UniProtKB/Swiss-Prot annotation:
Protein name per its UniProtKB record: Elongation factor 4
UniProt catalytic activity: GTP + H2O = GDP + phosphate + H(+)
Major subcellular site: membrane
GO biological process: positive regulation of translation
Cysteine-cysteine disulfides: none
Gene Ontology MF annotations: GTP binding; GTPase activity; guanosine tetraphosphate binding; ribosome binding; translation elongation factor activity
Any one cellular-component term (Gene Ontology): plasma membrane
Biological classification of the source: Bacteria, Pseudomonadati, Pseudomonadota, Betaproteobacteria, Burkholderiales
Top class in the EC scheme: hydrolase
Domain tr-type G: 2-184
Classification via InterPro entries: EF-4, EFG_III/V, EFG_V-like, EFTu-like_2, G_TR_CS, LepA_C_sf, LepA_CTD, LepA_IV
HAMAP family: LepA (MF_00071)
Length: 602
């Protein structure tokens, strides 16, 4: 076990993490030059396009060090985005060390810090690396100072490298061997392995990526998942050298994959512990307790997804089921809306996660979707003392029954160059943020705010990027539920409530948002043969109204001169017809109208 090193790479988006992983794989001969391609570990199209890593991937590499020994290096590539922080913490807990990659021209950014703290909390050894040293504007001294200031680890011996040109790769590998500890664990005890990630393969079922902590798992043994208590036989196991390579057994300290022909991903939960089913003469028996750190992930953001054609509901359900195979943190349940028909209420980890799920549904499964405005989970205390959780505005009880509503509050860390502090603070205050702290680290400023999650969900991230010209970065973590004066604003069209357009907002903004949504609807809904009234209401109080004028035919065109009563008769007849139409007519709300709410400015 002394010759094994498990490490991962922590970096902010675009700091060159995946490119560095490519270079390390190339240097260790994991793939021949013919098979090498850019960002080898980011296998989904969407990962490539957005330049982000979503699922954790691994590579088991052989490296011959300068001391002549051959070491087994297991590189575990982690996602960098705050939405996937649970996957990051699983990947990191499977490692003993991490390379902290910082772009020498940009310095430390928010997600680097968040993930680095996770690593330090888990007791992982962090080795700083300064990437992109080949750029003319690289400033290594400033980057080192920021690492020491912001993260508080010693950066004197940070390794300069350039993943693009391949400079400094050997130094990094030597540092991995010299500075990171070998894995701990009992190679002869009852086997325990942690599931770092799992995904669904069309041919073999669920593939589990595991880090074996104690003991040995062999082909053909029956294993038990400790969180779900289900038992499966091992059909194949092996390692990825990015390509998959079958082995007979995985030993303590190794990272590899196990395939058991499992049909549904729910059985293999990320973070769960795998052990043997029962004691047999030739094995060490099942483990007594699971590895620490497993938790069920709770979605933070909810939105409705509906097919554009009612007939495609079944396809959407299939698509969601398949996507869920690869994404255990996605939750969904069927719901019916009067306006949109049958669809699903989906729960996501955060906004990026939501966008990615939508995009994968559209791209990989060819679905046309309508998405309702994202909302968060509110705790509602009723007059009787019961507390219910409401994640869908249309499920909010009537005003008279509610004692208080509590909304989720998050702590937000914002990092930006000091030139942008003013605009960012203005934005945070508009979003009901309460400033907790402000710290200067060299040229960077870190602001800490408490904010309602509901305010972040809509468009905070986009606005933050625009007021700071893309320089600010953020991450957030859930803090608590806190009582707040929020109300549900209903949108009525000709007196009928359209449930998919309901929004929950703070009372101070309710008038403004109600007016803005009504105005938006007026632009989107086509003119009918009769007047259409669009109203925004809180309970029974109407707070805003817009009218769409009727289309009318000029019934007087054929009258020349003559008596006024003749004209009046024709106008009255038209009016009576319009009134009759209005009683039986229903207004079609077009798809665009539902999307338009998402773009309502504050």
């Amino acid at each position: 076990m002394d010759h094994i090193r498990n490490f991962s790479i922590i970096a902010h988006i675009d700091h060159g993490k995946s490119t560095l992983a490519d270079r390390i794989i190339q240097r260790c001969g994991g793939l021949s030059d013919r098979e090498m391609e850019a960002q080898v570990l980011d296998s989904m199209d969407i990962e490539r396009e957005r330049g982000i890593t979503i699922k954790a991937q691994t590579a088991a590499l052989q490296y011959k060090a300068r001391d002549g020994q051959v070491y087994n290096l297991n590189l575990i590539d982690t996602p960098g985005h705050v939405d996937f922080s649970y996957e990051v913490s699983r990947s990191l807990s499977a490692c003993e060390g991490a390379l902290l990659v910082v772009d020498a021209s940009q310095g430390v950014e928010a997600q680097t810090v968040a993930n680095c703290y996770t690593a330090l909390d888990l007791g992982v050894t962090v080795v700083p690396v300064l990437n992109k040293m080949d750029l003319p504007n690289a400033d290594p001294d400033n980057a080192k100072a920021e690492i020491e200031d912001v993260i508080g680890i010693d950066a004197d011996d940070a390794i300069p490298c350039s993943a693009k040109t391949g400079m400094g790769i050997d130094e990094i590998l030597e540092a991995v061997i010299a500075r990171m500890p070998p894995p701990k664990g009992n190679p002869d005890g009852p086997p325990r392995a942690m599931i770092v990630d799992s995904w669904f393969d069309n041919y073999v079922g669920v593939v589990m990526l595991v880090r074996v902590v104690d003991g040995t798992l062999g082909k053909g043994e029956r294993i038990r998942m400790m969180a779900t208590n289900s038992v499966y036989p091992i059909e194949h196991l092996g390692v990825f050298t990015p390509k998959s390579e079958n082995r007979e057994a995985l030993k303590a300290g190794e990272v590899g994959f196990i395939i058991c022909g499992i049909k549904e991903l729910q059985a293999a939960k990320v973070g769960d512990t795998v052990t043997l089913e029962k004691k047999l003469p030739n094995n060490a028996g099942p483990a007594a307790e699971a590895l620490p750190g497993f938790k069920e992930i709770q979605p933070q953001v909810f939105a409705g997804l509906y097919p554009t054609e009612a007939s495609e509901y079944d396809q959407l359900r299939d698509a969601l089921e398949k996507l869920k195979l690869n994404d255990s943190s996605l939750r969904y349940e069927p719901e019916v809306s009067q306006a949109l028909g049958f669809g699903f209420r989906c729960g996501f980890l955060g906004l990026l996660h939501m966008e990615i799920v939508q995009e994968r549904l559209e791209r990989e499964f060819d679905q046309d979707l309508i998405t309702t405005a994202p909302s968060v989970v509110y705790e509602v205390q009723l007059n009787g003392g019961d507390v219910i959780e409401v994640e869908n505005p249309s499920k909010m009880p009537e005003v008279g029954k509610i004692a208080e509503i509590r909304e989720p509050i998050v702590t937000v860390h914002l990092y930006m160059p000091q030139d942008y502090v003013g605009p960012v603070m203005t934005l945070a205050n508009q979003k009901r943020g309460v400033q907790l702290n402000m710290a200067y680290h060299g040229r960077q400023v870190m602001l800490t705010y408490e904010m309602p999650l509901a305010e972040i969900v809509l468009d905070f991230f986009d606005k933050l990027k625009s007021v700071s010209r893309g320089y600010a970065s953020m991450d957030y973590e859930f803090k608590e539920y806190r009582a707040s004066d929020v109300v549900k604003v209903d949108i009525l069209i000709n007196g009928d409530r359209v449930d998919a357009l309901s929004i929950i907002v703070h009372r101070a903004q309710s008038q403004y948002r109600g007016r803005a949504v009504a105005a938006k609807m007026r632009e989107q809904i086509p003119r009918q043969m009769y007047d259409v009234a669009i109203q925004a209401a809180i309970g029974a109080n109407i707070i805003a109204r817009e009218n769409i004028k009727a289309l009318r035919k000029n019934v007087l065109a054929k009258c020349y001169g003559g008596d006024i009563s003749r004209k009046r008769k024709l106008l009255e007849k038209q009016k009576a017809g319009k009134k009759r139409m209005k009683q039986i007519g229903s207004v079609e709300v077009p798809q665009e109208a539902f999307l338009a709410i998402l773009q309502v400015e504050d």
